[in-house]
From Swiss-Prot, chain A:
It is a single-pass type II membrane protein. One of its GO terms (molecular function) is metal ion binding. The keyword Transmembrane applies. This is Cytochrome c-type biogenesis protein CcmE. GO terms for cellular component: plasma membrane. Residues 141-167 are annotated as: Disordered. The gene is ccmE.
Length: 167, 659
C-alpha cells in the first residue's frame, strides 16, 4: 500500500463520516429546532400543532388552577407577556421554583383551540432573576427599559397586566 | 498567617513566578543554555507552593467565617456545615478560577517531579507553556475576579449557599471535572513544545499518552458524577439534558478520547503525528472555551457580561491568545512533521483512524448543536433552542459504526490485517452479540435502542474474547495461560476494561430509553400500578429539619403482592432562602431503579390528595458504573510500566547491562 492510496482511503473515510454527520445534523435541525415564542406571537400567528415551541412569559397572578382528568392531575395557568395571554395545560409536578406572578418557560405544542399543552415547565430562577428570553420580550414590548433601572417587581407588573387584560 | 492579604500576595507572587517560568526556559532553550532551562522545574514547584498557599488562605477565610471578604460574605454563612464551607470555596466564579489555576500549577509540579527522564529542553519548554497559560489565568483572577476582595462594612452573616448545591456529589464534582479539563493542558504543552522543536517521534508519543490518559480518566469520572448528580438531586428522572454546560464537558471528552487513541499510533508506528498534535491543541482549546465561555454565560447569552464587560473581554483575549497562538504555530510548523509508518486501511492503525474520524464527527455535531442557537440569536435575532431530540437523531447513528469498529479494532494486528483471519477470532463474540440482539428485540422497543444494545453486547464480548485469545485460553496449558496473563501488558488489560465500560454505559443508556413513568394524584392508602409494580402511598408526615421544614411520604412498592421496598421521598422548604427542594427516593437492585418523587399536597381533611411522580428506570446505574469502569481501565493502563515516563530508558539500560 503506497502513501497515496492510503491517503485516498483516509480522505474517503473522512468525507463519508463528515458527510453523514452533516446530513444527520441538517435533518435533525429541520425537524427538531425549537423556537421561542411569546404569548402575543402565538396569538398573532399560531404555529401548527405538530410543532414544538418554547413559550415564555409571566404566570398571570391568580390564574393557576387544577383540573383532574381521569385521576391524572393537570395544572392549568395563563402565561402572559403583557399583550396577550395563553392558557397552558401541564400534566405533572410543577417545578419547585414555579410561582404565580413570576416568569416561566414552557415546552410544548399549541393546540387547535389556541391552548398550549406543555410537556415540560421550567422555572429555573429566584426572586430577582428572569429568563433571558422573558427579559428580552419585556424590553421588546416596552414594559421595561433596562436604561431606567431594574426590572419591575414581577408580581405588581403582572397584576397590572391582568387588569389590563381583563379590562 | 492565613489572612486574605497574605493570600492575595501569594497569588500575585505565583503570577510573577509563572511569568518567569514562561519566559526564562523558552529563552534558555533557544540559546541552548542548560542552566536557564534547568530553572523551569524549580519555578514550577515554587509557583505551585505560592498558589497552594493562596488557595489555603481562601479556604481559611471561609472556614473562619471572615465575612469582611466579599466572596465569603456572598457565598457562605455561619450556619453552613464545615464540609460545605470548604467545598463552597469553589462553588462560585472567583473561587473556581483560583481552583482552576491551582490544578494547572499542580500539573506543572507533576511534570517537574515525574518528568525527570524527559530531555531537559523539552521539559523546559513544556513547563514554559504551562507557566504561560497559568500566568494568563492568574492575571485574570487578580485583575477581574479577585477572590480576596474586602467588603466594608463587613456583614454579620453571609448570604448562604443555594440549598440545591449543598450536596456531597456536587461538592467534589468540580475539582474532578476541572482536573480533567486542566489535565489536557499537559498534552497541549507537549504539542506546542514539539511544534517549537519541530520534531515528533515515538518517544514523544510515549511521553504524552500517560498525561492524556490521566486527564481523560478524570474527565470521564467528572462527567459521570455530574450526570449522576442531576439524576438524584434534580428529581426530573433524567440524567443528561444536553444543555450547553453539559455539552462543554462532552466536547473535550470526545476529542480527548480521540487523542488517547491517536497517540497510540504515534507511539507504536510513528504515524498520525500532525493529527495528534492538532488533537492535543483542539482538546485543550475546547476545555478552555468550555469552562470559561459557557460557565460565564457568553454562550448562553452574549450580553451576560454586560455588568462586568472587563471580564468578558479579558477572557476572550486570553482564549484568542492561547488558541489562536497555538493554531498559528501549528499552521507554521506542522508541515515539517512527517509520518513514516505505512499501513493498510485494514489494520490496527486503520481502525484507530476510523475511531478518530467518527469521534470527531460526533464532536462536530455536538459543537454545531451547541453553538447554533447563540449564533442564530446573534445574527438573526431569533431565539431558538435545540434539545435531546436533535442530539439523539444526529449523534446516535454515528455512534453505531463506532461501536462496531470498537469490537473489530482491538482484534486487528498492526500494519496489515487479513480480514478472514481476524473474523475467525471474532466468531464467538459475534455469536454472543447475536444472542444479545435477540434479547434486545425481546426487551427493548425502537430500532436505535435495539441496535445500540446489540452493539454494546458486541463490544463487551469482543473485548473479553480478545483478552481470552491473547492469554491463550484453550490453546495452552493452565501454566501457560498464567504466564501469558502475567506477560500481557497492563495497557491491554486497561484498554479492554475501558471498552467494556463503554459497552456497559451504552447498555445503561439503552435501558434508560425504555424508562416508564406516571404522574398520579392519590389519597393516602390508594394504590397505583406502574409496569407491573404496585405503588401504595402509606402515609405522609411533616417534620422539622435543621434549617428546613419537610414533608415526607412513605410509599410501599409491591411486586406480585411481595413487598419490594418502602420509599421515603421528601419535599423540603428552606424558609430563609425561600426555596423548596425535592429529595428523590431511589431503590436500586443494580438492574432497575425505582424512583419516587412527592409533589404538592391538595385539599384538606379526608379529601387531602398528593401528587406523586413514579419512575421505573431499567439499567440506570449501569450508565455511571460504565463510566467508572472506563476510568478504572484508564488508570490500569497508566500503571503499565511502558506508560511510565522513562521506563523504556531504564529497561534498555538493564538490557545493556545484561548484555
Amino acid at each position: 500500500m503506497t502513501r497515496k492510496t492510503r491517503r485516498l482511503w483516509i480522505v474517503i473515510a473522512c468525507l463519508a463520516c463528515v458527510g453523514s454527520a452533516a446530513a444527520l445534523t441538517l435533518r435533525a435541525f429541520s425537524s427538531n429546532i425549537v423556537f421561542f415564542m411569546a404569548p402575543s406571537q402565538v396569538k398573532a400567528n399560531p404555529p401548527s400543532p405538530d410543532r414544538t415551541i418554547r413559550l415564555g412569559g409571566m404566570v398571570m397572578a391568580g390564574s393557576l388552577h387544577r383540573i383532574n382528568e381521569n385521576g391524572t392531575p393537570v395544572n392549568a395557568f395563563e402565561v402572559t407577556d403583557g399583550q396577550a395571554a395563553v392558557e397552558v395545560h401541564y400534566t405533572g409536578i410543577l417545578p419547585d421554583l414555579f410561582r404565580e406572578g413570576q416568569s416561566v418557560v414552557a415546552l410544548g405544542t399549541v393546540q387547535k383551540d389556541g391552548g398550549f399543552t406543555a410537556s415540560e415547565v421550567l422555572a429555573k430562577h429566584d426572586e430577582t432573576y428572569m429568563p433571558k428570553e422573558v427579559a428580552d420580550e419585556l424590553k421588546r414590548t416596552g414594559k421595561w427599559d433596562p436604561r431606567f433601572g431594574k426590572a419591575p417587581d414581577a408580581s405588581s407588573w403582572d397584576t397590572m397586566t391582568a387588569k389590563k387584560a381583563g379590562g | 498567617m492565613f489572612g486574605p492579604e497574605q493570600g492575595h500576595f501569594a497569588l500575585a507572587l505565583a503570577c510573577v513566578l509563572a511569568l518567569v517560568q514562561f519566559a526564562v526556559p523558552l529563552w534558555g532553550a533557544s540559546r541552548r543554555d542548560a542552566r536557564l532551562v534547568g530553572l523551569a522545574p524549580y519555578l514550577a514547584v515554587s509557583q505551585l507552593i505560592a498558589l497552594g498557599y493562596s488557595f489555603l488562605c481562601l479556604v481559611m477565610c471561609a472556614v473562619s467565617d471572615d465575612f469582611s471578604v466579599q466572596n465569603v460574605a456572598a457565598n457562605s454563612a455561619v450556619s453552613k456545615p464545615l464540609l460545605y464551607k470548604i467545598t463552597g470555596v469553589w462553588g462560585n466564579h472567583e473561587g473556581s478560577v483560583l481552583l482552576w489555576t491551582l490544578i494547572l500549577a499542580v500539573c506543572g509540579g507533576a511534570v517537574s517531579l515525574f518528568g525527570r527522564n524527559l530531555p531537559d529542553i523539552l521539559r523546559g519548554r513544556v513547563l514554559a507553556i504551562l507557566g504561560g497559560v497559568s500566568a494568563g489565568f492568574q492575571m485574570f483572577c487578580l485583575l477581574t475576579s479577585d477572590p480576596f476582595d474586602r467588603v466594608f462594612p463587613a456583614p454579620m452573616d453571609g448570604q448562604g449557599m443555594n440549598p440545591l448545591l449543598q450536596d456531597p456529589g456536587l461538592a467534589f464534582h468540580p475539582p474532578i471535572l476541572y482536573t480533567g479539563y486542566v489535565g489536557f493542558a499537559v498534552p497541549f504543552a507537549f504539542a506546542v513544545a514539539a511544534l517549537i522543536e519541530g520534531r515528533v517521534d515515538a518517544a514523544w508519543g510515549r511521553w504524552v499518552r500517560p498525561w492524556a490518559v490521566a486527564a481523560w480518566c478524570f474527565l470521564t469520572c467528572g462527567i459521570a458524577l455530574g450526570s449522576w448528580w442531576s439524576y438524584y438531586v434534580l428529581g426530573w428522572g433524567g440524567y443528561w439534558f444536553w444543555d450547553p454546560v453539559e455539552n462543554a464537558s462532552l466536547i473535550p471528552w470526545l476529542t480527548g478520547t480521540a487523542l488517547v487513541h491517536s497517540a497510540i499510533v504515534v507511539e507504536k508506528r510513528e504515524g498520525l503525528k500532525i493529527w495528534t498534535v492538532l488533537l492535543a491543541i483542539a482538546t485543550f482549546s475546547f476545555s478552555l472555551s468550555g469552562t470559561f465561555l459557557v460557565r460565564s454565560g457568553i454562550l448562553n447569552s452574549v450580553h451576560a457580561f454586560a455588568n462586568d464587560p472587563a471580564r468578558g473581554v479579558f477572557i476572550l483575549a486570553l482564549l484568542a491568545i492561547v488558541i489562536g497562538g497555538s493554531l498559528t504555530l501549528f499552521a507554521w510548523r506542522a508541515p515539517s512533521l512527517t509520518s513514516t509508518g505505512l499501513f493498510s486501511p485494514v489494520s490496527r492503525e486503520g481502525s484507530l483512524v476510523l475511531n478518530n474520524i467518527l469521534l470527531c464527527s460526533i464532536c462536530a455535531v455536538v459543537v454545531t448543536g451547541t453553538m447554533y442557537p447563540p449564533f442564530m440569536q446573534l445574527l438573526a435575532g431569533r431565539t431558538i433552542s435545540v434539545g435531546k431530540p436533535f442530539f439523539d437523531a444526529a449523534t446516535i447513528p454515528l455512534t453505531l459504526p463506532l461501536l462496531l469498529a470498537m469490537g473489530v479494532g482491538t482484534a486487528l494486528p498492526w500494519k496489515r490485517a487479513q480480514l478472514a483471519r481476524t473474523f475467525s477470532h471474532l466468531y464467538a463474540a459475534a455469536g454472543i452479540a447475536a444472542i444479545g440482539l435477540v434479547l434486545c428485540f425481546w426487551k427493548l422497543s425502537g430500532i436505535l435502542p435495539i441496535a445500540c444494545g446489540a452493539l454494546a453486547v458486541w463490544v463487551i464480548a469482543a473485548s473479553v474474547s480478545d483478552v481470552l485469545r491473547r492469554i491463550g485460553i484453550g490453546h495452552t496449558s493452565v501454566q501457560g495461560v498464567w504466564e501469558r496473563m502475567k506477560n500481557l501488558p497492563r495497557s491491554s488489560w486497561g484498554a479492554a476494561l475501558a471498552h467494556i465500560g463503554a459497552g456497559i454505559t451504552i447498555l445503561g443508556l439503552c435501558g434508560m430509553s425504555q424508562a416508564e413513568h406516571a404522574i398520579v394524584e392519590v389519597h393516602i392508602g390508594e394504590t397505583r400500578s406502574l409496569a407491573g409494580d404496585d405503588w401504595t402511598l402509606l402515609d405522609v408526615h411533616d417534620y422539622i429539619g435543621p434549617n428546613y421544614k419537610a414533608m415526607q411520604a412513605d410509599i410501599a412498592i409491591r411486586h406480585n403482592g411481595k413487598l419490594v421496598t418502602i420509599l421515603h421521598p421528601e419535599k423540603r422548604d428552606f424558609t430563609t432562602q425561600s426555596q423548596t427542594t425535592t429529595e428523590v427516593a431511589i431503590h436500586t437492585n443494580f438492574i432497575t431503579d425505582l424512583y419516587g418523587v412527592i409533589g404538592d399536597r391538595h385539599g384538606t381533611g379526608q379529601d387531602t390528595t398528593y401528587v406523586l411522580r413514579l419512575h421505573r428506570n431499567p439499567l440506570a446505574p449501569w450508565m455511571w458504573l460504565g463510566g467508572l469502569v472506563m476510568a478504572i481501565g484508564g488508570a490500569f493502563s497508566l500503571s503499565d510500566r511502558r506508560m511510565r515516563i522513562g521506563a523504556p530508558k531504564r529497561a534498555s539500560a538493564r538490557n545493556m547491562a545484561r548484555a
